Amino acid sequence: MNIFRFFEGRVEAALRSLEEEGVLPSGLDLTRVAVEPPRDPSHGDLSTNAAMVLAKPAGMKPRELAEQLAVKLGGEEAVTEVDVAGPGFINLRLNPAFWQARIPEILRSGPAYGASDVGAGEAVNVEYVSANPTGPMHVGHVRGAVFGDALCNLLEKVGYRVCREYYINDAGGQIEVLARSAFLRYREALGEDIGQIPEGLYPGGYLKPVGQALVAAHGRSLLEKDEPEALSIVREAAVEAMMELIRGDLGVLGIVHETFFSELALHRSGFVEQTLKVLEDKGLIYIGELEPPKGEVPDDWEARPQTLFRSTEFGDDTDRALKKSDGSWTYFAPDIAYHLDKYNRGYRTLIDVWGADHSGYIKRMRAAIAGVTDGNAEFDVKICQLVRLFRNGEPVKMSKRSGDFVTLREVVDEVGKDVVRFMMLTRKNDAPLDFDFAKVMEQSRDNPVFYVQYANARIHSVLRNVAEEGTYDLSDGALANADFTLLTDEAEMALVRLMAGFPRLVEQAALAHEPHRIAFYLDDLAAAFHGLWNKGKDDHSLRFIRADHRDVTLARLALIRSAAYVIAAGLAILGVEPTEEMR
């Protein structure tokens, strides 16, 4: 249960009661009424802004309305104290029994705790990774991949129907470079001495198997074909091989896309032209000449009449070109078509996960989607900043041009999938992230993935030891019937309150498209558990197992089993397996 939504309902009921009594006018808009944790925890457990946002439409002073509402809320069974603070905020303190009742609720839910139907089955398209199919995944791709996948998990947790999509950029200039690079490896596989890889081609050895496969499939016949025909065959084979490589790389991170959308297929279908016709019919395309941009002039800017999209009508800084001087499309045109295709497939919420180098593209894309869908699609771009790779504090140097880069598989092989996934979510996506191979494996408080997993392992160690003794029924049903009024220490109650806040945290993280909040929460939850563990070391009366007090033991076992479920629920969103035993 999201206790904050529950109390929003109680506040709303109190307001309706005041309406019936004639204190408030009927028909007030309650959409801005919220119940949240107070900024200062010493002020109470919950706080509502109801009086502040309703006073003006109600024709009352905020504090006057707050005092009347406080009387109503004070009659709630779970409320022990109501305080009107400042100009009219209302702070509530809840009785321990209300908090303690959350433990059996968590035990009944298990790892599904925190799930909700806020999304109501709405279809959401999340496009992430979409790396050019020109080689294996490298460490620069990892953050966006993990972020996008965790975001999908998060949205599904709160009831959205999510499509995990990968856009295959198989129609650009880099694919031409790939084809020529693979053709060179084909000649090498036939026994030719290709010497030094020419500047501008991909030098990585990962294309050697592509060359060998081409020889197995075609023998020497490609050498006898015209270059365009030969390169067309090589291009298709190379892209297919690279996508197979990429799927495998993503698989080691536990990432599986359900939809792969080809840019080349988009062009061949004629849908780019159809999309431009849609924009033309809406009066959003014209022939014009753009002013030169301020500062450094981009390579693709041309001082000539062009086919332009009226991007400024939707908040962009300038209108945008859709065709180049040679008659070919700019990158922008097929991107508009691709997003219209998503919209036509029934998605009204479109989320794109991009690298930091694409941040300047957001305004034009947002403008285009607003224009082509008549403003009926919600479009959100999540930018993932760079990952700086270190080893023992020293930066790891990489160059994709020279083929000297750390691959995704190398990172996962060294530290493990779960460490990689968790660490990629320990910073907000738009903040740079440092990843040190040594530090992420440290068993210390400074390593969040260890700290959270250690809390879970400690819990399972206690439960295993008790199970081996066979003196307690550790089924969830038996634990749910424990006497939770015996949990009176502030550290115990702090842990309960933190767990009770998890459903709200999940909902807010999902609506904000910010899965890193789950990682932050898990660190806080682990800290609360470890704090309780350490108190038990200093004060024997606070130990989880009390040989002299069976009922206290049962209540505490229920408490820590609940904590393990919440940890498991949070880790599942991150795509991380809970560790039950440290090795």
Curated annotation (Swiss-Prot):
GO terms of biological process kind: arginyl-tRNA aminoacylation
Regions annotated as coiled coil: none
PROSITE patterns cross-referenced by the UniProt entry: AA_TRNA_LIGASE_I
EC number: 6.1.1.19
Localization: Cytoplasm
Annotated GO MF terms: arginine-tRNA ligase activity; ATP binding
Domain of life where this protein originates: Bacteria
Chain ranges for the short sequence motif 'HIGH' region as given in the UniProt record: 131-141
UniProt entry tagged with the keyword Aminoacyl-tRNA synthetase: yes
InterPro entries listed in its UniProt record: aa-tRNA-synth_I_CS, Arg-tRNA-ligase, Arg-tRNA-synth_N, Arg-tRNA-synth_N_sf, ArgRS_core, DALR_anticod-bd, Rossmann-like_a/b/a_fold, tRNAsynth_Ia_anticodon-bd
GO cellular component: cytoplasm
Reactions that this protein is recorded to catalyse: tRNA(Arg) + L-arginine + ATP = L-arginyl-tRNA(Arg) + AMP + diphosphate
Keyword Protease: no
UniProt keyword list: Aminoacyl-tRNA synthetase, ATP-binding, Cytoplasm, Ligase, Nucleotide-binding, Protein biosynthesis
Entry's family note: Belongs to the class-I aminoacyl-tRNA synthetase family.
NCBIfam families, alphabetized: argS
Oligomer status and interactors: Monomer.
Name under which the protein is recorded: Arginine--tRNA ligase
Source organism per UniProt: Parvibaculum lavamentivorans (strain DS-1 / DSM 13023 / NCIMB 13966)
